[in-house]
Amino acid sequence: HILIILTYLAHETERHYLCSMKQELKENGGLPAHILWTLAIVAGVSVANLYYNQPLLNIMRHELEVSEFKTNLIAMITQIGYALGLLFIVPLGDLYRRKNIILTNFFLLIFSLLAIAMAPNIYIIWAASLITGICSMIPQIFVPIASQFSRPENKGRNVGVVISGLLTGILASRVVSGFVGEVLGWREMYFIAAGMMLLC
């Protein structure tokens, strides 16, 4: 029931945000500051999901009682998923409505993060990590959005803001997950990650 409620709220939040963005924006018409910074923040929060696992691998290995090799595969599978997302999902933004792609990826991302948090074994974590990696390519859709709706003279600056948000997420994710993992536990980190995606 909790999962159903969370996914419903995620869908409604993103639908409201994207509908309002659609109403306000016109191509080359200018990107309002609040939307630009929302794109940057969500880009950072989304891409951070790729790196939360790295400081947590040792803690996960001891709790799940698996080999170091199997645990290290979590990080590798996540990055493979990201590569697959870049290869197969991002190009769909030129063929289909970006709104639908973003909504679908948000839904799947929240689901996969919750699946990792509640996973009873390493195999479910592997599968959920692959989905997490695939769906964490959302920032790569935000970059062309920032470019498309910015005025010509602001395109470079606005794209830079979104990319800065992305890079901040990459750098901050390991610090945050390492701290939360030591204080609360690795499962709690993924519950927090799902909550952050929901708030976005």
Mark where each language-model region is.
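Extracytoplasmic
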Residues: I41-E68
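Residue-level signature of mid-helix packing/kink "hotspots" within the transmembrane helices
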Residues: Y51, Q79-L87, M137, I170-L171
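Membrane-interface helix termini in secondary transporters
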Residues: I59, V90-P91, F179
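Paired small-residue
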Residues: S112, Y123-I131
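Helix-loop-helix hairpin linking two adjacent transmembrane segments in secondary transporters
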Residues: I124, V161-C200
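Cytoplasmic helix-loop-helix junction between adjacent transmembrane helices
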Residues: A128-S164
